[in-house]
From Swiss-Prot:
The gene is lppE. The keyword Lipoprotein applies. A lipid is attached at C22 (S-diacylglycerol cysteine). This is Probable lipoprotein LppE. Keywords: Cell membrane, Lipoprotein, Membrane, Palmitate, Signal. One of its GO terms (cellular component) is plasma membrane. It is a lipid-anchor. Residues 1-21 form the signal peptide.
Length: 140
């Protein structure tokens, strides 16, 4: 009787350990972000995303280039607040809601798209303010 109890207890422990190992959360790596600036598409490392209150920040860093976008989450709507583009193909520029440039944003599950035009300076025309189209696709 004592041997059966030890055997049943041992089997129960093995089954419990197996089930708990299967029940642990699996993390799936995020996809690479895609940036299109002035018609040229770049695939970068996955975006770093954070959220404070209703504002989601999407931060994409790749070598010497940086793109940051902040969107306001309001119910099902995603409203772009600002985008800063630094040193992407020699372009440095910004979009600001109610200010310079224009943008629209969309969210499909956990993938954000922010697209529009930014004003700034390009190394191609360093003495002229230019408007450049951008498209950001990032998973958060």
């Amino acid at each position: 009787m004592c041997n059966r109890l030890v055997t049943v207890t041992g089997v129960a422990m093995v089954v419990a350990a197996g089930l708990s190992a299967c029940g642990q959360a699996q993390t799936v790596p995020r996809k690479a972000a895609r940036l299109t600036i002035d018609g040229v598409t770049h695939t970068t490392r996955p975006a770093t995303c954070s959220q404070e209150h209703s504002y989601r920040t999407i931060d994409i860093r790749n070598h010497d280039s940086t793109v940051q976008a902040v969107v306001l989450l309001s119910g099902d709507r995603v409203i772009p607040q600002w985008v800063k583009i630094r040193n992407v193909d020699g372009f440095n520029g910004s979009f600001w809601h109610g200010g310079v440039g224009n943008a629209r944003a969309d969210r499909a599950r956990n993938t954000y798209t922010v697209a529009g035009s930014a004003y700034g300076i390009s190394s191609k025309k360093p003495n002229t303010v230019v408007s450049t189209d951008f498209n950001i696709l990032a998973e958060c």
